């Protein structure tokens, strides 16, 4: 039996821990807050996230070193912009898992690190010293609440080492969760990071009262700019046509369960950034920070991303949503 440590007890970390346990994997969850670890261990539920979901038998702890002891699969389930700081604190125990148990590090985080413009797999490699072949990423249309409820879903596990991707696939395959494998780590990560930004745009449009034509146009043109950036960075175009691209984008842009869409909806309806934060119950809307780093990454590679730029201007430069829409519609017309 595979032994997994899930580091992070937010919505997605909790839901994925349930997936692993349902697949027959031995799971220990690390929670930052001691009271959450206690509830997970004794009540098999997370009172802060997904409180109505009953988890199978999992262990839980507030001690990351204890969670990592003997782990063959390490699931990194913390927000993208705090990943580096967490990895730095966990580094000795992570190195022990790698050196003693040949552990695979699996990132659930979706984002581009602010400042360095690194993808999450690159941050993991830089901080832990893990070889590229040991690092995998998971991306797809994976809304945590639906998966925790056992609703059918699919995802992509990408790793340059196909055998490791297959091992993670086996450890997370259940009757309701179907993982596919891929070796295109770049494509999966760029798709996962950028879709949050486009979801903000779709939420803004919905909040403004715009209709399905507008939303469909944003999703389609959003995919076009995501694909431009991903291919420039070395991704395979077909990856963006799959679960880690179109699949993730559609789910995040259209579902009321999407934090990024919900955040954008408040802005589109005339609410402030503070009101939008309250609407997501204090949980991270990754696209708010990602739009800055994705925009900078695109600029560094001379890739045009007008939707990302518009979202950044609304979230960080104070322009109104109507100004943003006007600037997009006023762009020079061109072939598709």
Curated annotation (Swiss-Prot):
EC number, as in UniProt: 1.1.1.94
Gene3D superfamilies: N-(1-d-carboxylethyl)-l-norvaline Dehydrogenase, domain 2, NAD(P)-binding Rossmann-like Domain
Pathway of action: Membrane lipid metabolism; glycerophospholipid metabolism
UniProt-annotated binding residues for sn-glycerol 3-phosphate: 110, 140, 195, 248, 258-260
Subcellular location field: Cytoplasm
Record carries keyword Lipid biosynthesis: yes
A single GO molecular function term of this UniProt record: glycerol-3-phosphate dehydrogenase [NAD(P)+] activity
InterPro entries given in the database record: 6-PGluconate_DH-like_C_sf, 6PGD_dom2, G3P_DH_NAD-dep, G3P_DH_NAD-dep_C, G3P_DH_NAD-dep_N, NAD(P)-bd_dom_sf
Main location: cytoplasm
GO BP term (any one): glycerol-3-phosphate catabolic process
Entry keywords, A to Z: Cytoplasm, Lipid biosynthesis, Lipid metabolism, NAD, NADP, Nucleotide-binding, Oxidoreductase, Phospholipid biosynthesis, Phospholipid metabolism
Catalysis: reaction(s): sn-glycerol 3-phosphate + NAD(+) = dihydroxyacetone phosphate + NADH + H(+); sn-glycerol 3-phosphate + NADP(+) = dihydroxyacetone phosphate + NADPH + H(+)
Annotated PROSITE patterns: NAD_G3PDH
Annotated NADPH binding sites: 11-12, 32-33, 110, 144, 259, 284, 286
GO terms for cellular component: cytosol
UniProt-annotated catalytic positions: 195 (proton acceptor)
Protein family per UniProt: Belongs to the NAD-dependent glycerol-3-phosphate dehydrogenase family.
Function per UniProt: Catalyzes the reduction of the glycolytic intermediate dihydroxyacetone phosphate (DHAP) to sn-glycerol 3-phosphate (G3P), the key precursor for phospholipid synthesis.
The protein's name: Glycerol-3-phosphate dehydrogenase [NAD(P)+]
């Amino acid at each position: 039996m595979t032994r997994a440590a899930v580091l992070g007890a937010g919505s997605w970390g909790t839901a994925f821990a349930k997936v692993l346990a349902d697949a027959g994997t031995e799971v220990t969850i690390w929670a930052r807050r001691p009271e959450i670890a206690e509830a997970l261990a004794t009540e098999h539920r997370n009172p802060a996230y997904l409180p109505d979901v009953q988890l199978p038998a999992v262990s839980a702890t507030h001690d990351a070193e204890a969670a990592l002891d003997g782990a063959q699969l390490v699931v990194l389930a913390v927000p993208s912009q705090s990943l580096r700081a967490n990895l730095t604190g966990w580094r000795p125990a992570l190195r022990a898992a790698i050196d003693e148990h040949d552990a695979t590090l699996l990132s659930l985080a979706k984002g581009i690190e602010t400042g360095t413009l690194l993808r999450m797999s690159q941050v993991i490699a830089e901080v832990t010293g893990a070889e590229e072949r040991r690092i995998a990423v998971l991306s797809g249309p994976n809304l945590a609440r639906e998966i925790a409820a056992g609703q059918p879903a699919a995802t992509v596990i990408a790793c340059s080492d196909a055998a490791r991707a297959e091992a993670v696939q086996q450890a997370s395959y259940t009757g309701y969760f179907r993982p596919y494998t891929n070796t295109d780590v770049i494509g999966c990560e760029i798709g996962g990071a950028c879709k949050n930004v486009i979801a903000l745009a779709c939420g803004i449009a919905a909040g403004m009262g715009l209709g399905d034509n507008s939303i469909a146009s944003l999703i389609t043109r959003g995919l076009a700019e995501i694909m431009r950036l991903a291919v420039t960075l070395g991704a395979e175009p077909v990856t963006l046509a799959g679960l880690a691209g179109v699949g993730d984008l559609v789910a995040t842009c259209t579902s009321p369960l999407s934090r990024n869409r919900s955040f954008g909806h408040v802005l589109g309806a005339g609410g402030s950034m503070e009101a939008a934060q309250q609407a997501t119950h204090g949980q991270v809307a990754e696209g708010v920070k990602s739009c800055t780093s994705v925009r900078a990454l695109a600029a560094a590679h001379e890739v045009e991303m007008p939707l990302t730029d518009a979202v950044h201007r609304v979230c960080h430069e104070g322009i109104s949503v109507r100004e943003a829409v006007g600037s997009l519609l006023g762009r020079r017309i061109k072939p598709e």
